[in-house]
Amino acid sequence: TCALPILVDHAREYIEDNYKRPIFDRIMRATLAQILPFDKRFRFAMKSARLVKPLAPLMPSKIRNMVDFAPKKIPVPSLNDKPQVFPAEGKCIKRVALMTGCAQKALDTDINDATIRLLRRHGCEVVVAQGAGCCGALTHHMGKSKQSHISAAKNINAWMSELNGDGLDAIVINTSGCGTTVKDYGNMFLGDPLENDAKTVGSLAKDITEIMIDLGLKVSSTSAVRVAYHAACSLQHGQQIKTHPKTLLK
């Protein structure tokens, strides 16, 4: 979300390819790149971290810090994350794909579940596309372009298949960092055979707040609730979405 994102992306890739990091850092980065983008692996890693927490004081500081961050409770996988179609409640206004992501599916399944319920109540048919998964942001930010492009290409192919089939009005994303990355797929795939499809997918990508502003949020209760709102950098700078979340909360 820096002012010169394309230059930063090139720099990350160049550093990854040309700078020889200390061996421990290389192992850590390679391990994270093979775990975080895969929800089942990430879930297994978190469960393992809980088991070894008593041994944390004996571990190197970097590993100890990660073990300490392991949540006490890991949610049960949601059946809603499997490829399927959820019909709209009442008249169907839009047909949208939901990006279920990767790490989020392991850390907090309620987010996708709530998003599906909200969209259906507002007249959206919600598609969880076969083959879609991690947006590629995690490895992209590490400068591991090959890995990030593999993840992104799977999403592009999955969503284009839906678009060319029964059609899509939008690709809904409820994680701002992922949304920033998907909207930038066109730049990521410049000069690639997938460039045109990547641009199409990027143009369809919408943050959940953009969709809800368009649909018009219907609330069942008018009782006042006091909340704290965190304006994510990737949302307000990366996507230039600054007022939608606050408007919806009000």
Give, region by region, the residue ranges found by the protein language model.
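Iron-sulfur cluster-binding electron-transfer modules in prokaryotic oxidoreductases
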Residues: I6-K250
